A protein has these predicted regions:
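A short macromolecule-binding patch
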Residues: 21-28, 53
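SH3/SH3-like beta-barrel fold
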Residues: 13-17, 24, 45
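Charged helix-capping and loop-helix junction motifs
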Residues: 90-93
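Structural detector for short beta-strands of small beta-barrel domains
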Residues: 1-9
């Protein structure tokens, strides 16, 4: 029987199957292989001694360690246009990590009823990243988010104060109740806020990821310097066009990326983020690279 993990607590995993949610444990072989099942994993269940066990884990598209979730399709990066002041560097780090993992980042601008979103809009208008402005008064932007959710596994990332909870409540007024209902069904009560829980909505799935509420970009993933240029999709048309092979797009002459920047075809703030991220990893040796 096949399904996907909706939650994992204390060595037990809860798998959504056509027959409902099944409590199970993984086979010991996974521990020997140093593989830990996580929410979002597509799995195959078998019965041993009358109990269900996870027998196979399908190959993952991607996996995040903090919080533990696999096979994400979309990561909504929630940012406020007022307080707290949005950090484009943090947003760019998270979006780059998402792209590097094969996840589509979507910038979501909240609190737009309090202030115009010109700062964020101008920072991302020349990027290829989708940008959604939310207006709770008119409901603008909510349908667009629902369209992104349809047919996909999504998560929301945003630090405290950016309005992530308000956004989720506007999208899913019953989400807290549904998450609680899942917890009650799993017999774990309400003290499960640290675990990832996946539930279905709008024809897709949403991973309730408390760890993304205070996510530290530097702990979310590591992109080596040779891959960093690919994590900024708007650089794509200019890659391979530079005068020198292995161009870092920072100081070299004949750099096509810098030329595009000078001609106004790329965002200065996005380019500055790229340079800052490059400087952080340029001297990191292979053996020093963190594992995620």
């Amino acid at each position: 029987m096949n399904g996907y993990i909706v939650k994992g607590i204390g060595g037990f995993y809860y798998v959504k199957t056509p027959d409902g949610i099944v409590e199970c444990k993984p086979r010991g072989i996974f521990r020997k292989q140093k593989i830990t099942p996580v929410a979002g994993d597509e799995v195959t269940l078998e019965t041993e001694n009358g109990a269900s066990v996870i027998a196979q884990i399908a190959p993952r598209k991607n996996v995040f360690v903090r919080p533990p979730v696999a096979n994400l399709d979309v990561l909504f990066l929630v940012a406020s246009t007022t307080q707290p002041t949005p950090s484009t560097l943090v947003l760019d780090k998270l979006s780059a990590i998402a792209v590097d993992k094969g996840v589509q980042p979507v910038i979501v601008c909240t609190k737009s009823d309090l202030a115009e979103a010109e700062f964020l809009r101008s920072a991302y208008e020349k990027s290829t990243l989708p940008f959604i402005r939310i207006d709770y008064g008119s409901g603008a932007g909510l349908d667009e988010i629902k369209q992104w959710i349809s047919g996909r596994l999504c998560a929301f990332c945003g630090n405290s104060g950016v309005g992530k909870s308000t956004l989720l409540n506007a999208l899913l007024p019953d989400a807290a109740r549904e998450t609680s209902a899942i917890s009650q069904k799993l017999g774990r009560g309400r003290h499960t806020t640290r675990e990832v829980t996946i539930f279905e909505a709008f024809g897709g799935r949403i991973a309730d990821t408390p760890g993304f509420a205070s996510l530290e970009a530097n702990r979310a993933g590591f992109i080596p310097k040779e891959n960093l240029e690919h994590a900024f999709p708007e650089f794509g048309p200019y890659l391979g066009q530079c005068q020198f092979t292995g161009c870092s797009h920072r100081t070299e002459k004949g750099c096509a990326v810098r030329q595009a920047l000078a001609e106004g075809r790329l965002s200065q703030t996005r380019y500055d983020s790229y340079c800052a991220m490059y400087d952080e990893v340029k001297d990191v040796k292979d053996w020093q690279r963190p594992k995620f």
